[in-house]
């Protein structure tokens, strides 16, 4: 059996997948691989304001899972508010130590409502925990345009200073 599409063939795209090397943001400056998966507590960003999603948050922030070894190396404890960052942006989240992840990998679900701490800042920082400020704004291929959220390298550190309030659910003035 052979499946073909004349319409797709007409696009002139390569017939086979190709290897896309990691972006320039990876490496020693940003040694952790971010998994930005679909959330278990809401449907994408729908119902982020709902009881199930809100109950999963820590100090009003989305949980980020991190291996205990990576957390210890950075002075991060369970429940600490942390800042994830790379050259694209930053976001705040709450650390959850987990042996379910390999060292060098952290996991922060997508779908948290974007809440810019300072909308005028050169580099965006979401105070609520949306990983989209860290990922490339590029689809996985010219055909699929899928999420490239699994191709993101970051660093993480304890957040110091006053914790900004989450205003994502506040109505406009």
Which residues are covered by each model-predicted region?
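Long, low-complexity segments enriched in small/aliphatic residues
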Residues: 1-52
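Long, contiguous, secondary-structure-rich segments that constitute the structural scaffold
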Residues: 49-65, 69-173
């Amino acid at each position: 059996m052979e499946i073909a599409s004349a319409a797709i063939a007409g696009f002139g795209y390569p017939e086979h997948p190709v290897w896309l090397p990691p972006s320039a943001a990876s490496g020693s400056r940003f040694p952790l691989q971010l998994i930005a998966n679909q959330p278990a507590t809401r449907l994408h960003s729908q119902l982020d304001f709902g009881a199930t999603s809100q109950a999963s948050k820590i100090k009003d922030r989305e949980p980020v899972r991190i291996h205990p070894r990576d957390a210890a190396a950075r002075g991060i404890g369970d429940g600490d508010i942390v800042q994830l960052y790379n050259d694209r942006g930053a976001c705040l989240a709450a650390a959850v130590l987990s042996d379910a992840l390999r060292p060098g990998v952290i996991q922060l679900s997508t779908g948290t409502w974007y809440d810019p701490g300072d909308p005028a800042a050169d580099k965006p920082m979401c105070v609520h925990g949306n990983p989209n400020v860290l990922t490339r704004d590029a689809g996985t291929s010219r055909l699929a345009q899928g999420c490239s959220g699994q191709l993101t390298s970051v660093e993480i550190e304890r957040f110091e200073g006053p914790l900004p309030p989450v205003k994502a659910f506040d109505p406009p003035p």
